[in-house]
Amino acid sequence: MLPSWTPGGHIDVQLPSGRRRQYSLCGPPGRRIDYRIAVRRIADGGGGSIEMHDAFDVGDSLVFEGPRNAFYLGAGERDVRFVIGGIGVTPILPMLHAAQQRAINWRAVYAGSSREYMPLLDEVVSVAPDRVTVWADDEHGRFATADDLLVDAGPATAVYVCGPTPMLESVRIARDEYANAPLHYERFSPPPVVDGVPFELELARSRRVLTVPANRSALDAMLDDDPTTAYSCRQG
């Protein structure tokens, strides 16, 4: 049996190159016979997703650590809104099953450019079709606004959001007026550097010094210098 896990949890996969990447568990909650993860291949990303797709085949073994969970479904929350964007569906799908099993009053909005590019869409809808709203930009002729994503979410509604940074930030700003309402989110990419200042970074082993511009991170500068630099989640 694999280690137990809870909805929102993830594992840290060690790739053959030495890279480490975090992937949310998106199978049935608590399943321990096997784990399911979803990996979107990103051509212009950091290389981890391409390596996952190219290095492994059916029957291969993965080396991983975990599971861990910093994005879990609160035990005492009874009125919940889930906001989903793109591959952000992976940690939230098991939460939907758990919320349904706990008889929580929940609703979900799944937004994306088109239904074709919304991973696991059928599985999300099948949890409870009357509780899930699908927003496809190509059907509406525009992106979903925070008002669209949070319709009927009241001042006491707990909100869980996982998706692209613009979606996450719009929801976060919209919920600022409800300071006491729980807001839970998980980022799959780092937030942009805002109001930064340039600085110099000394690499301890090589004693080399890199200049980091005001609008970039230390890791960005290291990757510019050596694209094979190993890193993990980029969340700091």
What kind of feature is each model-predicted range?
Residues 37-39, 80-84, 222:
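Well-ordered beta-strand segments characteristic of repetitive beta-sheet solenoids
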Residues 15, 25, 39, 73, ...:
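Hydrophobic residues in beta-strands and at strand termini
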Residues 211, 216-236:
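Immediate flanking context of iron-sulfur cluster ligation sites
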Residues 17-19, 206-208, 227:
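Short acidic/polar mixed-charge low-complexity motifs
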Residues 1-65, 112-114:
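Ferredoxin-reductase
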